[in-house]
């Protein structure tokens, strides 16, 4: 039986994540179709490998799509969210640095469309998030430490993923402490350590290729199709 491809709009198509999304989606033309690629500035070419490109200022005129994948900048987030709500399309967003007002807008939009916002779209990290929460619940009174390591060009510390894992630990009743390391070209490593008297548990995730984040975002887009409106976590989509 023929399956209609999921129509995607890639917002932030000129960035590193946007380029990875375009490349990986092109490997699955039977299930994924890039309806539009949106860049911050006017594109040098209007059509590349059959994909229509638009400037962010032209976003309202983008063709029909089922799900938008947004890895852009906070200033481009509002019009993307508004367009998804207007068209009843799902939204997968990994845009960082959004304000509290923008987070409130996300929560309001979740009443009308299915969406997921995450600091990390690795499926392994999604599983780690659940394991951390469960461990914190089971190990009341144990010390909880989160150590994150990244390449030397990463400026923010602790990383957004470390803070997300810390929130999972807090939901389980732990009080996490953070440490950060910047060295070489480390893509990303997150260690969550629970220490009791005479014993220690270490939960760790190591990323060796940035494509895992784009693959996770494409997985999330597929999983949002046909879902009821709501705000989902990546780990929810694994159920």
UniProtKB/Swiss-Prot annotation:
Residues that coordinate or bind NAD(+): 12-17, 94-96, 118-121
Keyword check for Lipid biosynthesis: no
The UniProt record lists the keyword Phosphoprotein: no
Residue numbers binding (S)-2,3,4,5-tetrahydrodipicolinate: 151, 160-161
Gene Ontology MF terms: 4-hydroxy-tetrahydrodipicolinate reductase; NAD binding; NADP binding; oxidoreductase activity, acting on CH or CH2 groups, NAD or NADP as acceptor
Keywords carried by this UniProt record: Amino-acid biosynthesis, Cytoplasm, Diaminopimelate biosynthesis, Lysine biosynthesis, NAD, NADP, Oxidoreductase
InterPro entries assigned to the protein according to its UniProt record, in alphabetical order: DapB_C, DapB_N, DapB_N_CS, DHDPR_bac, NAD(P)-bd_dom_sf
Active site per database record: 150, 154
CDD domains, alphabetized: DHDPR_N
Localization of this protein: Cytoplasm
GO process terms (BP): diaminopimelate biosynthetic process; lysine biosynthetic process via diaminopimelate
Described purpose of this protein according to its UniProt entry: Catalyzes the conversion of 4-hydroxy-tetrahydrodipicolinate (HTPA) to tetrahydrodipicolinate.
PANTHER family reported for this sequence: 4-HYDROXY-TETRAHYDRODIPICOLINATE REDUCTASE 1, CHLOROPLASTIC-RELATED (PTHR20836:SF0), DIHYDRODIPICOLINATE REDUCTASE (PTHR20836)
Name this protein carries in UniProt: 4-hydroxy-tetrahydrodipicolinate reductase
Organism: Stenotrophomonas maltophilia (strain K279a)
High-level lineage: Bacteria, Pseudomonadati, Pseudomonadota, Gammaproteobacteria, Lysobacterales
Record gene name: dapB
